[in-house]
A protein has these predicted regions:
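Non-catalytic interface/targeting segments
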Residues: 1-53, 57, 85, 91-125
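Mid-chain, well-packed structural core segment of small domains
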Residues: 59-95
Length: 125
């Protein structure tokens, strides 16, 4: 089964790019299509401008693109709950220096589920 994985990234995106450590403030998303533990395709998607409540806009954008999992180093509680509502699994990849390192850790089953303990507390809860 194919899975589309999104990773908040610094420009220009891609597997060699530095991970964007806060999902809502990243430059771009790297989208990685995976099947049977192998990377099939890598592409990028722009992050919409961050405005009031702006962390929820990318959730919808990524859901509409067919994303099923997201790696993140940080995010607020509201977007985490929104990802749960749209059926996107979120994994904590705070120690990954690059997108590729995060993806490899995900493929190896080394990343924990992103839970409330990892959230930052900016904005309304």
């Amino acid at each position: 089964m194919k899975t589309l994985l999104a990773v908040p990234s610094c420009l220009p995106g891609g597997l060699d790019a530095e991970m964007g450590m806060h999902f809502g403030h990243c430059d771009i998303y790297t989208l990685v299509e995976i099947e049977d533990g192998k990377i099939l395709n890598v592409s990028t998607m722009d992050n919409p401008p961050h405005q009031q409540g702006g962390c929820l806009a990318p959730v919808q954008l990524l859901a509409q693109a067919g994303v099923k999992a997201l790696l993140a180093g940080g995010m607020g509680f509201r977007p985490l709950m929104a990802f749960h509502q749209v059926g996107i699994d979120v994994f904590f990849a705070g120690g990954a220096p690059t997108v590729g390192a995060g993806v490899n850790a995900y493929l190896a089953g080394q990343l924990p589920q992103f839970t409330e303990e990892y959230t930052c507390h900016g904005g309304a809860q």
